[in-house]
Amino acid sequence: MATREHELRPEQERLGEDREEYEDGEEEEEEGEEGWDDWESDGDDAGGGGGGGGLLCLFCSARFDSESSLFSHCASEHRFDFYRVVKETGMDFYGCIKLINFVRSKVAENKCWSCGQVFSSNSELCGHLHALEIPQLEGKVPWGDDVYLKPFLEDDSLLHSLSVFDDDDEDDCGMPMEKGGCSAGNGSLAETCESNLKSIINDGSDVIDRFERTCTIESTDGECSGSLAQEPSDKQLKIARASAAARGIKSVDESYFGSYSSFGIHREMLGDKVRTEAYRDALLGNPSLMNGATVLDVGCGTGILSLFAAKAGASRVIAVDGSAKMVSVATEVAKSNGFLYDENMEMQQKRDTQVITVVHTKAEELNHKIQVPSNKFDVLVSEWMGYCLLYESMLSSVLYARDHFLKPGGAILPDTATIFGAGFGKGGTSLPFWENVYGFDMSCIGKEVTGNSARFPVVDILASEDIVTETAVLNSFDLATMKENEMDFTSSFELRLSESGVSQSGVTWCYGIILWFDTGFTNRFCKEKPVNLSTSPFSTPTHWSQTIFTFEEPIAMAKEESAVVSSASVGTDECPAVMIRSRISIVRASEHRSIDISIETTGISSDGRKRSWPVQIFNL
């Protein structure tokens, strides 16, 4: 799947006395059946003990109008005394944020937040819940990781409503307020910070700079600055930055999913026969895997993979996509072809093929939208690959779905992926075109274009005859077992001139490195019909093309028997390199869904001399 759209350490704050007991929340939601036929969407109208309020309980679907009533309900119904935990652990504001997100994440996994025991359903979990033994923590809380600063639920109203740290103690200001103007100024400052914080949390506006200007400005009499302004600045800025980061991710995701809302990219992907037929053959050609299987399709798009799965005999298919437009389209497509599951239809009226349900959500939030039964899925299928394999970072969503929704021993399709690299010659650049444009020499333009290519990766299809070196394997991924951090890697490899790359003069110029990937539906899961999907320049072209990284200057190469001039620089006509030793690092970029690539290059001559070129950094 690819598109062409090219000090969180706050100071400790002291807590006052424990809060008073509040009104008990009402009864939790009734537990429903957990069979495959009873999946329901967890819409915004979820009922529960608190009626129609906006604050969702940490453990059940009850909603409340206030933080106090919610935590009173948690204490009485779920034995989770939030205020006691906060007081006894000495948590600051950020600790509270982390605790809430930690508990929500564990409950989503049907895991006890206190002892870690795992259950098959939310009802079993709620029946087990017990108070946390604070002394057993030995000073280290399990929610201490900064990862829990990121809201587990999108737009979690509870995080916006926390008042446990409302602070009326003048001592916390850091200096006495002797001037009347200071007192008034500080009140205005707090209001400004609160307003700006809400702006960041609610609409993702970039007002952090405004925070910093407001929180450090002196009062009109010039005598109220420094620590007085700094105290609210610290707390507000830190939560603002955390929230802004989360909003930045959300913004990129919205743009990403929005790019898949147009039909052009889907026409291109469906028309990619190599891609689509590989998935079709893997799903339809392995009946022992697919017949009667429950299937999760992550990033379903038009739903083509779900249709293949249903046609292959799957008993239930859940198709997930982050684009509301494509969810609507996939639903209509499934309905038009007689595969859409209708939960309102009587069982005797349903056909065996009516098995597909399409859900609008990210994979990471699936269990907030539907109730995933304890037996989970037999098969996870996804077309997640981007340019250079890892662009778009969709693999992390697939791995999350594998770890949370695929049953032990279940199949992930595809189950392997490999990145390859090779050196390419002049034909892989635009130089030949510019050297003869209707009989005119425009090579000056070609040189400028090639120079620009040395700063930006190019996604294009190269002809196999333009590959001048042997192929090297950069990295292989076992998608059934790999960890998310393995998406970031460094690979060292060597490139030697191939037989077909040798020119008549004996010297061949290598202009850069090209990367491509294969994915495998291996006989580990596809026993009847293993399939390999290749984006190699030696195979039929695909919509992924290849990813081209051009050197700042080309490197002359020759076979080992070539004579060299000892005084000449390695990689030149007089001293061609017999081998290029390269190290490539590919890591997820700070910009969500992008990747950074660094390339280190060293040429080695036949007499053993070496020459290294400056590191090149690319962003894709």
Swiss-Prot record:
<keyword id="KW-0949">S-adenosyl-L-methionine</keyword>
<dbReference type="InterPro" id="IPR055135">
    <property type="entry name" value="PRMT_dom"/>
</dbReference>
<dbReference type="GO" id="GO:0005829">
    <property type="term" value="C:cytosol"/>
</dbReference>
<feature type="zinc finger region" description="C2H2-type 2; degenerate">
    <location>
        <begin position="110"/>
        <end position="137"/>
    </location>
</feature>
<dbReference type="GO" id="GO:0008270">
    <property type="term" value="F:zinc ion binding"/>
</dbReference>
<dbReference type="InterPro" id="IPR041698">
    <property type="entry name" value="Methyltransf_25"/>
</dbReference>
<dbReference type="GO" id="GO:0000976">
    <property type="term" value="F:transcription cis-regulatory region binding"/>
</dbReference>
<dbReference type="InterPro" id="IPR029063">
    <property type="entry name" value="SAM-dependent_MTases_sf"/>
</dbReference>
<feature type="binding site">
    <location>
        <position position="321"/>
    </location>
    <ligand>
        <name>S-adenosyl-L-homocysteine</name>
    </ligand>
</feature>
<feature type="zinc finger region" description="C2H2-type 1">
    <location>
        <begin position="55"/>
        <end position="78"/>
    </location>
</feature>
<dbReference type="InterPro" id="IPR049482">
    <property type="entry name" value="ANM3-like_C2H2_Zf"/>
</dbReference>
<keyword id="KW-0963">Cytoplasm</keyword>
<dbReference type="GO" id="GO:0035242">
    <property type="term" value="F:protein-arginine omega-N asymmetric methyltransferase activity"/>
</dbReference>
<keyword id="KW-0863">Zinc-finger</keyword>
<dbReference type="GO" id="GO:0006355">
    <property type="term" value="P:regulation of DNA-templated transcription"/>
</dbReference>
<dbReference type="GO" id="GO:0042054">
    <property type="term" value="F:histone methyltransferase activity"/>
</dbReference>
<comment type="function">
    <text>Protein-arginine N-methyltransferase that catalyzes both the monomethylation and asymmetric dimethylation of the guanidino nitrogens of arginine residues in target proteins, and therefore falls into the group of type I methyltransferases.</text>
</comment>
<protein>
    <recommendedName>
        <fullName>Probable protein arginine N-methyltransferase 3</fullName>
        <ecNumber>2.1.1.319</ecNumber>
    </recommendedName>
</protein>
<keyword id="KW-0489">Methyltransferase</keyword>
<feature type="binding site">
    <location>
        <position position="323"/>
    </location>
    <ligand>
        <name>S-adenosyl-L-homocysteine</name>
    </ligand>
</feature>
<dbReference type="InterPro" id="IPR036236">
    <property type="entry name" value="Znf_C2H2_sf"/>
</dbReference>
<keyword id="KW-0862">Zinc</keyword>
<dbReference type="Pfam" id="PF22528">
    <property type="entry name" value="PRMT_C"/>
</dbReference>
<feature type="active site">
    <location>
        <position position="392"/>
    </location>
</feature>
<dbReference type="GO" id="GO:0005634">
    <property type="term" value="C:nucleus"/>
</dbReference>
<feature type="binding site">
    <location>
        <position position="364"/>
    </location>
    <ligand>
        <name>S-adenosyl-L-homocysteine</name>
    </ligand>
</feature>
<dbReference type="InterPro" id="IPR025799">
    <property type="entry name" value="Arg_MeTrfase"/>
</dbReference>
<feature type="binding site">
    <location>
        <position position="275"/>
    </location>
    <ligand>
        <name>S-adenosyl-L-homocysteine</name>
    </ligand>
</feature>
<keyword id="KW-0479">Metal-binding</keyword>
<dbReference type="GO" id="GO:0035241">
    <property type="term" value="F:protein-arginine omega-N monomethyltransferase activity"/>
</dbReference>
<keyword id="KW-0808">Transferase</keyword>
<feature type="active site">
    <location>
        <position position="383"/>
    </location>
</feature>
<dbReference type="GO" id="GO:0016274">
    <property type="term" value="F:protein-arginine N-methyltransferase activity"/>
</dbReference>
<feature type="binding site">
    <location>
        <position position="299"/>
    </location>
    <ligand>
        <name>S-adenosyl-L-homocysteine</name>
    </ligand>
</feature>
<feature type="compositionally biased region" description="Basic and acidic residues">
    <location>
        <begin position="1"/>
        <end position="17"/>
    </location>
</feature>
<feature type="compositionally biased region" description="Acidic residues">
    <location>
        <begin position="18"/>
        <end position="45"/>
    </location>
</feature>
<keyword id="KW-0677">Repeat</keyword>
<dbReference type="InterPro" id="IPR013087">
    <property type="entry name" value="Znf_C2H2_type"/>
</dbReference>
<dbReference type="Pfam" id="PF13649">
    <property type="entry name" value="Methyltransf_25"/>
</dbReference>
<dbReference type="Pfam" id="PF21137">
    <property type="entry name" value="ANM3_C2H2_Zf"/>
</dbReference>
<feature type="domain" description="SAM-dependent MTase PRMT-type">
    <location>
        <begin position="253"/>
        <end position="582"/>
    </location>
</feature>
<dbReference type="GO" id="GO:0006338">
    <property type="term" value="P:chromatin remodeling"/>
</dbReference>
